[in-house]
Design a protein with these regions (language model features):
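Terminal amphipathic alpha-helical/low-complexity segments used for targeting or macromolecular assembly
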Residues: 1-10, 15-17, 21-22, 58, ...
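Structural signal for interior beta-strand "rungs" in well-ordered beta-sheet cores
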Residues: 6-191
């Protein structure tokens, strides 16, 4: 790796910006004062990284992406807030990620994420490691996306909602409540449809683990039990992944998307 950044002569880099070893900055890109870019990151043509943004190592910021813009919040007063991005992310064309609204606040993108073209991440959002946002996903403020979650194209998520770990959301879904971990949510409005078996297998879940999760799913979403009774019976399964579902439900402030009448079994 070249120990010096490679900056195209038409790019604009602020005097106080810090670029790590091997950083590449393409034609007409803009990196404002105070930005930190980790080694090996590539900022392609016409991308903009605005002040108060820190981006880690080995990221690819594609053409026309704008990172760290001011939040679209009528209450924003110009406070110093931040955008923090981890390592090894792919941020494709036209993606917009805004910094936080509240003084001292952060918008956070983890590591190993893939944000496809024209996805939007609003102020105070948190995106966990390995999450994927497909084309035109739109996250309102304060949304929390769990690790390895997959949001298909055109999904819109209401402010303050949470999407659990290894959850999947179908294309063009409208999300106004929390989406359970390990579960496929789909539709307008969103409904829990089934376990995300493909995603779980990719995450290393074996046959025994899947059977236990299917039973937890059945108790929570496909039985006639009262919620508290279902959670108690789920806890009796003694499984840490099921316990994660229980904790997610108990921590919900907006409620969670339940199964629709046409929802399938957990297969």
């Amino acid at each position: 790796m070249n120990s010096f950044p490679d900056v195209h002569p038409t790019a604009i880099v602020g005097g106080s910006a810090r670029l790590g070893a091997g950083v590449k900055v393409g034609p007409y890109a803009v990196i404002e004062d105070g930005v930190e870019v980790g080694e090996g990151t590539e900022v392609r043509a016409h991308a903009v990284i605005k002040r108060y943004t820190t981006i880690g190592r080995g990221n690819a910021v594609h053409e026309g992406a704008i990172l760290g813009g001011e939040p679209q919040d009528v209450g924003f007063t110009g406070a110093e807030t931040r955008l923090r991005i981890g390592d090894g992310n792919k941020i494709r064309e036209g993606v917009t990620i805004h910094r936080a609204t509240r003084p001292g606040g952060e918008t956070v993108v983890g590591s190993g994420c893939f944000l496809m073209a024209y996805a939007h991440v609003a102020h105070e959002c948190t995106i966990g490691d390995g999450a994927i946002l497909a084309n035109n996903v739109a996250l309102a403020g304060h949304v929390d996306i769990g690790p390895r979650a997959f949001l298909s194209g055109g999904v819109v998520v209401h402010q303050f909602c949470r999407v659990g770990r290894i959850a999947m959301i179908g294309g063009n879904s409208k999300i106004v409540q929390d989406c359970l971990p390990f579960v496929v949510t789909d539709g307008v409005p969103g409904r829990a449809r089934a376990l995300n078996v493909v995603g779980l297998r990719r995450a290393g879940a074996g046959a025994a683990q899947l059977r236990t999760l299917k039973e937890g799913y059945r108790l929570l979403l496909r039985s006639s039990l009262r919620l508290e009774t279902a959670l108690e019976r789920m806890a009796a399964l003694g499984d840490p992944w099921v316990d994660e579902m229980i904790s997610f439900v108990r921590g919900s402030k907006r409620g969670f998307h339940h199964a629709g009448r046409d929802a399938g079994e957990a297969d």
